[in-house]
Design a protein with these regions (language model features):
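Active-site-proximal helices and loops of the catalytic beta/alpha 8
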Residues: 1-48, 65, 73-74, 79-86, ...
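Short, basic, glycine/proline-bearing loop/turn elements
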Residues: 51-70
Length: 177
């Protein structure tokens, strides 16, 4: 049985351009003291607010200049996807996260809204959202095409915390096969 690792807060803080509480190292289970491969990590779920929604509504306007700028938002979300999908272990991509869906998951404040959500295939007609989708696609291809990089015997260095903000965040993988 797999455990869940909720990285929503760190993901949202990073994407909104706030360094405080922006730790995304938990996308890799051993960084949280869990066994390799024991945990499905995620940035979004039915219980958590969508990252794109939070960037749009609460993003750091001093850093992002214009939080409603679709291209800038999709670029931040693509960078977050890279942090999530280059970390070994199972991941969950939730309901059009790969297209930057900004539909809220809440109703009446903080109550979870589990009603069916709209399906926006027309998002693929937006070049910025299509770019985000392509980023997810390429990152998934990278994982499938290089299983040794994501194996238990691979060596991983993740620098995706608030203290890595100024120097730049990265994940370094060394082939384990």
């Amino acid at each position: 049985q797999l455990n869940w690792s909720n990285i929503n807060e760190g993901s949202c803080q990073y994407a909104m351009a706030f360094s405080d509480n922006s730790n995304c190292n938990g996308f890799y289970a051993p960084n949280y003291g869990r066994n390799w491969g024991s945990t499905v990590s995620y940035a979004e779920s039915h219980d958590e607010e969508r990252v794109s929604y939070k960037v749009l509504n609460y993003g750091n306007s001093a850093t992002l200049r214009n939080t409603s700028n679709n291209g800038q938002r999709m670029t931040r979300l693509g960078s977050l996807a890279a942090q999530m999908l280059t970390a070994p272990g199972p991941k969950m991509i939730w309901q059009f996260q790969e297209l930057g869906n900004e539909q809220t998951t809440k109703k009446n404040g903080n109550e979870n809204d589990t009603d069916p959500k709209g399906i926006y295939w027309n998002y693929l007609n937006d070049a910025n959202r299509k770019g985000l989708y392509d980023s997810y696609s390429e990152l998934c291809w990278l994982r499938r095409s290089n299983p040794d990089l994501f194996s238990q015997s691979a060596t991983i260095t993740m620098k995706c915390t608030a203290s890595d903000w100024s120097a730049g965040r990265y994940t370094h993988l060394v082939n384990g096969g």
